[in-house]
Amino acid sequence: MNPSHPAVHPVEAPPTDVHHAPRVRMKDYQGMPGTLGGLALRLGQFCFAVVAFSIMLSTDDFSTVTAFCYLVAATVLQCLWSLALAVIDGYALLVKRSLRNSLVVSLFVVGDGVTATLTFAAACASAGITVLIGNDLRECDQNHCGKYETATAMAFLSWFMVSPSFLLTFWLLASR
């Protein structure tokens, strides 16, 4: 046997078909960042927060109550956060990239947790004031109780859309 010629020759692997490769991995559950479900949740968060913000701004006396000012501030933050992440999710879907970077996922978890907490607290505070004005003081004829209730309900729905995003992203981070 000649030592300069190996007895085993390399075998060329068959080329992979890149056009039919699976786009979503098994661990990509809908609702996680970079999925169509995640984009839908982000757009839902954004829409509900915009509606709550718009309804609250349509009243002329929301600024006299601290809880309503807090609701406006929380929904503005929720709008900005949800829109930014919806753009990132949409881009990830367009270029078929996975958002699995630990730093990115950590940022998403912290941001979702903060905005979810702020939105929920603002909705609860606004609900308390709305009940106080409507049921206890019985001054709905002098105030915009219907608008306050609708804005509060939209804030709760926005929080309801943030919660799955937060839980799924937290699960993604914790499962690393």
Curated annotation (Swiss-Prot):
The chain crosses the membrane at residues 36-56, 68-88, 103-123, 153-173. Residues 57-67, 124-152 are extracellular. It comes from the Eukaryota. Its main location: membrane. Residues 1-35, 89-102, 174-176 are cytoplasmic. Keywords: Cell membrane, Membrane, Transmembrane, Transmembrane helix. It is a multi-pass membrane protein. InterPro entries: CASP_dom (IPR006702), CASPL-5 (IPR045009). Belongs to the Casparian strip membrane proteins (CASP) family. PANTHER family: CASP-LIKE PROTEIN 5A1, CASP-LIKE PROTEIN 5B3. Homodimer and heterodimers. This is CASP-like protein 5A1. It comes from Ginkgo biloba (Ginkgo).
